[in-house]
Amino acid sequence: MLIKNSVFLITGGASGLGAATARMAAENGGKVVIADMQEDAGGKLAQELGGRFAKCDVTSEADGKAAVALALKEFGGLQVLVNCAGIAIAERTIGKEAPHDLGRFTRVVTVNLIGSFNMIRLAADAMAKAGPNAAGERGVIVNTASVAAYDGQIGQAAYAASKGGVVGMTLPIARDLSRNGIRVCTIAPGIFETPMLLGLPKEAQDSLGKQVPFPSRLGRPAEYAQLARAIIENEMLNGETIRLDGAIRMAPK
């Protein structure tokens, strides 16, 4: 799938990995719809890139449908979905005062796993109704998991479960959508320069970066976007989760 003239719907596109992907798409001739809850940042970036912004809670069917509809209305189609929206918490299964709050666990799984699936099913439905390109492709879907899906740390039960679910559904969804000419892959980033990590003191950031075997630094959002581009452009990449982590394997804590 060529980036040029493809229409992108990017959840969590107002910042971090999603924003870098939106910039990559626009710089290479793609048309971008940023779907996010951050109206100010998302709207500003969309305007800068000549794209559109949709306020979108990925767990909402109505919001998801509206974001897809905006892409179809404004740009005449939808070829690429990149799921970057997500949340994280740190909470042990049994705390000092009480067991893990069930509502907080449910919220993380709902946003990260169910929210991703919600956007996949809605975007894929729109993609499947369009005509294929010369290679028979109708669309590409890129999800975001995490190395926590494999190396979940202490306090990451909810987050690891949610991202493990994203990894687990990648292959079956790719197989489901193969007859429609839609490819599905997932990126599992390691420790990256996201807004959350950049809020830490510089010493803490450097310490985290040194845990990465090579290169011994935090990953850059542009590197995530670079891999997303490779997935989109390579027709044979399908049904796979790719770790983007500098060979790190997370310690228990």
Predicted regions and their residues:
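Active-site helix of classical SDR
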Residues: 120, 162, 170
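C-terminal substrate-recognition "lid" of short-chain dehydrogenase/reductases
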Residues: 220-244, 249
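Catalytic Tyr-X3-Lys loop
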Residues: 87, 98-118, 142, 159, ...
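Catalytic Tyr-x(3-8)-Lys segment
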Residues: 110, 203-223
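Residue(s) in the substrate-gating loop at a strand-loop-helix junction
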Residues: 146
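Alpha-helical segment proximal to the catalytic Tyr-Lys
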Residues: 125, 174-176
